[in-house]
From Swiss-Prot:
Amino acids binding substrate: G169, S207
Originating species: Rhizobium etli (strain ATCC 51251 / DSM 11541 / JCM 21823 / NBRC 15573 / CFN 42)
Pathway terms, separated by semicolons: Carbohydrate biosynthesis; gluconeogenesis; Carbohydrate degradation; glycolysis; D-glyceraldehyde 3-phosphate from glycerone phosphate: step 1/1
Keyword Isomerase recorded: yes
Origin organism lineage: Bacteria, Pseudomonadati, Pseudomonadota, Alphaproteobacteria, Hyphomicrobiales
Name of the protein: Triosephosphate isomerase
Enzyme class label: isomerase
Amino acid sequence: MNPMQADAKQLLQEFKQLLQENEITEEKCNIGLAPVTLALTSTQAELANAARSVFTVAQDVSRFGNMGAYTGEVSAELLKDSQIEYVLIGHSERREYFAESAAILNAKAQNALNAGLKVIYCVGESLEQRESGQAEVVVLQQICDLASVVTAEQWPHIVIAYEPIWAIGTGKTASPEDAQTMHAKIREGLTQITSHGANMAILYGGSVKAENAVELAACPDINGAL
């Protein structure tokens, strides 16, 4: 729920300057920004004159479709009409603090995909689940939950993001080896579900910083960072 508008504008100017100075071209990587809802359209407008294309990502979308009367909600259709390209679904904070179940996330994914949005779908396991040996089962089940509402034609419009929840704020660290092991399992699961699985992007949503970014990027099944 931050930063404030003035701070966000300053950060955006600094971001655009970095793009220009470092010549980070589209051939090198895709880049997206996920500002708070109130800053979505202003961010998109500001990025229109950036040195390269940067897509705008909504942090959430309503589980209710058809532009109904749901006070406070932001529909997939409204995001699409505002020319937003991607939306985050299933982020660990939404799962934890808002108790978003598989049914709720499925509804959000369906609405987003049917409206023509692309989905960044987050999966991950807790510390308790990992220590009990259930990590792979939990993560693959989350992907299977998504698969139950996705058509064959929609898979190319989905990006998977793995969040090692057990390593966020617990004092434990997910090594590049840990991340690659889970990403490989996710890749294996995706290839069993869809013919697009081998080519789908799988992002790492752990603590990515300058000190470990290169090592993480070198892992064969890690295609970027969240």
